[in-house]
Amino acid sequence: MSAPRAEEQPSRSGERQPLVARGPRGPRRWRRTAAAAVLLVQMLERAAFFGVTSNLVLYLNSLNFNWDGQQASRATLLFLGASYLLAPVGGWLADVYLGRFLTISLSLLLYLAASGLLLTTITNDGRRSFCGEMPELPLEPACPSSSCQGSWSSPYCATTLYLVLLLLALAASSVRSTLTSFGADQVMDLGRDATRRFFNWFYWSINLGAILSLLVVAFIEQNISFLWGYSIIVGLVGLAFFIFLFATPVFITKPPTGSQVSSMLKLAFQNCCPCRRSSSRDSESAHLLPDQRSNQPGPSPQEDMANFQVLVKILPVMVTLVPYWMVYFQMQSTYVLQGLHLHIPNIFRTNPNISLLLRSDSSNYRIPEAWLLLANVAVILILIPVKDHLIDPLLLRCKLLPSSLQKMALGMFFGFTSIIVAGVLEKERLQYIAANQTVPQLIGKDLYYAAPLSIWWQIPQYLLIGVSEIFASIPGLEFAYSEAPRSMQGAIMGIFFCLSGVGSLLGSGLVALLSFPGGWMYCPKDFGNINNCQMDRYFFLLAGIEAVTAVLFLWIAGRYERTRQDPASQRSSSRVRG
């Protein structure tokens, strides 16, 4: 039986409590219901997101568009980068103008519209409406000379597709930056332990959506039809939007409190220019009497300064995580390249009783290398419930539960071990290549010369990067939310995700830098492969970068913990977080 309705309960700062009556067990029950709705929305949104990214290169490279592989890869990287770098936009809109509930609702609506536009590009009529007729493929002139340069032309339907992908990235980034803090708002009144558990299960739902997308949506797109696959994506986003609106009565919604980003920038400028510091401080004190400061809307100058001091302490912690993100995103780039040059077994064993045609087809049907991401996802799906129900309660009873910063340091260690394992495996692989011990294997229409090492040797590095997520990314989310000033929680969550995107771009930039002549990734004699590269040194370089920043992180984290234990700092932080 559903709970009877009650009048809307206003609270401080215009906060709206759930439209449900509260019995003796009401608060905890409805808070869990609200959190469960947020987790379900997150799972559906992530399933839709991975459904787009997993086969986007294949879709753009299909006969519908005939994009080159380089053009399709560039579009995918742009989409992934934008989906992280645009995260502060959604957080800022939520803090200043719309509030988190309305920002999420509008973002899901934009998500639905953009995915619908992507769906229309599959049909011939839809492509003609948005892009016109596809031009005939021109015959390239003979170009025997190395100095001959072909003419560059924009790929078919590029403007429409880039616009659709940009809208999808904006919607996904806004949902990512605001849904996290909105879900934490639902359980904040239940204590810090409830917030910690929420972030554990929030990350669990992300990976559950990923595994469902990789197993179902990506398979349908590749083996049945993109029309069916993208229709499922639209349905997932529509269902997420419906569930979010349906759960409105049980949500705690908070009005926009205003973002202090501009105030923070002004204070940063004043602190960098001592000549302006005293004059601005004198002008503020001269124009504001004590009784006027209490009636002034928004944060007072003193609160602005306290927020700025908290922000100055938080940002170094988040910035030192950037090298970890450089390592983390290798599992979607260089780890995949490495796997393509290891021996990949067939899905079906060749049966001597079947026809020659079927035998040929089955022998080329290999396990998708991207499915090794399932090892990363599986370890998260298994370990998060174990950690939440067994390990953390035991450590809490023994008063040995580590802080968020200590967990993040442990996560950086596991990321370091993952990239070291990848480097050792690559070094071993290159020894087989140097001895000319290669195995030709056909993956799709591309021929690769792989080392006779099974691809299953990559599983340890995927498992280790999965464990690192549990200890680095989840506590990082918890740290960003719980330590941020209340009026900047959305923006800080956006900055957290933005910095992860910066790590991805820095990793790509390092690959590009090492691809110049003389670099470790420069392979002019082996176009499309990495057998003449020295990617093991690239892995070890990343490990060295993360090791150095891990030491810096430990120093910054220790200093942060000592400052946080200071009584004056505790009083200031409690006032800031409200």
From Swiss-Prot:
<dbReference type="InterPro" id="IPR018456">
    <property type="entry name" value="PTR2_symporter_CS"/>
</dbReference>
<feature type="region of interest" description="Disordered">
    <location>
        <begin position="1"/>
        <end position="27"/>
    </location>
</feature>
<keyword id="KW-0769">Symport</keyword>
<dbReference type="GO" id="GO:0010008">
    <property type="term" value="C:endosome membrane"/>
</dbReference>
<feature type="transmembrane region" description="Helical">
    <location>
        <begin position="201"/>
        <end position="221"/>
    </location>
</feature>
<dbReference type="GO" id="GO:0045087">
    <property type="term" value="P:innate immune response"/>
</dbReference>
<dbReference type="InterPro" id="IPR000109">
    <property type="entry name" value="POT_fam"/>
</dbReference>
<comment type="similarity">
    <text>Belongs to the major facilitator superfamily. Proton-dependent oligopeptide transporter (POT/PTR) (TC 2.A.17) family.</text>
</comment>
<feature type="transmembrane region" description="Helical">
    <location>
        <begin position="77"/>
        <end position="97"/>
    </location>
</feature>
<keyword id="KW-0812">Transmembrane</keyword>
<comment type="function">
    <text>Proton-coupled amino-acid transporter that transports free histidine and certain di- and tripeptides, and is involved in innate immune response. Also able to transport carnosine. Involved in the detection of microbial pathogens by toll-like receptors (TLRs) and NOD-like receptors (NLRs), probably by mediating transport of bacterial peptidoglycans across the endolysosomal membrane: catalyzes the transport of certain bacterial peptidoglycans, such as muramyl dipeptide (MDP), the NOD2 ligand.</text>
</comment>
<feature type="transmembrane region" description="Helical">
    <location>
        <begin position="367"/>
        <end position="387"/>
    </location>
</feature>
<dbReference type="GO" id="GO:0015647">
    <property type="term" value="F:peptidoglycan transmembrane transporter activity"/>
</dbReference>
<dbReference type="GO" id="GO:0015835">
    <property type="term" value="P:peptidoglycan transport"/>
</dbReference>
<feature type="transmembrane region" description="Helical">
    <location>
        <begin position="232"/>
        <end position="252"/>
    </location>
</feature>
<feature type="glycosylation site" description="N-linked (GlcNAc...) asparagine">
    <location>
        <position position="223"/>
    </location>
</feature>
<keyword id="KW-0399">Innate immunity</keyword>
<feature type="transmembrane region" description="Helical">
    <location>
        <begin position="538"/>
        <end position="558"/>
    </location>
</feature>
<feature type="transmembrane region" description="Helical">
    <location>
        <begin position="494"/>
        <end position="514"/>
    </location>
</feature>
<feature type="transmembrane region" description="Helical">
    <location>
        <begin position="462"/>
        <end position="481"/>
    </location>
</feature>
<keyword id="KW-0458">Lysosome</keyword>
<dbReference type="Pfam" id="PF00854">
    <property type="entry name" value="PTR2"/>
</dbReference>
<keyword id="KW-0472">Membrane</keyword>
<feature type="glycosylation site" description="N-linked (GlcNAc...) asparagine">
    <location>
        <position position="353"/>
    </location>
</feature>
<keyword id="KW-0571">Peptide transport</keyword>
<dbReference type="GO" id="GO:0070434">
    <property type="term" value="P:positive regulation of nucleotide-binding oligomerization domain containing 2 signaling pathway"/>
</dbReference>
<keyword id="KW-0653">Protein transport</keyword>
<keyword id="KW-0967">Endosome</keyword>
<feature type="transmembrane region" description="Helical">
    <location>
        <begin position="405"/>
        <end position="425"/>
    </location>
</feature>
<keyword id="KW-0813">Transport</keyword>
<keyword id="KW-1133">Transmembrane helix</keyword>
<feature type="transmembrane region" description="Helical">
    <location>
        <begin position="102"/>
        <end position="122"/>
    </location>
</feature>
<dbReference type="GO" id="GO:0071916">
    <property type="term" value="F:dipeptide transmembrane transporter activity"/>
</dbReference>
<keyword id="KW-0325">Glycoprotein</keyword>
<feature type="glycosylation site" description="N-linked (GlcNAc...) asparagine">
    <location>
        <position position="436"/>
    </location>
</feature>
<dbReference type="GO" id="GO:0140206">
    <property type="term" value="P:dipeptide import across plasma membrane"/>
</dbReference>
<protein>
    <recommendedName>
        <fullName>Solute carrier family 15 member 3</fullName>
    </recommendedName>
</protein>
<dbReference type="GO" id="GO:0015031">
    <property type="term" value="P:protein transport"/>
</dbReference>
<dbReference type="GO" id="GO:0015293">
    <property type="term" value="F:symporter activity"/>
</dbReference>
<dbReference type="InterPro" id="IPR036259">
    <property type="entry name" value="MFS_trans_sf"/>
</dbReference>
<feature type="compositionally biased region" description="Basic and acidic residues">
    <location>
        <begin position="1"/>
        <end position="15"/>
    </location>
</feature>
<feature type="transmembrane region" description="Helical">
    <location>
        <begin position="33"/>
        <end position="53"/>
    </location>
</feature>
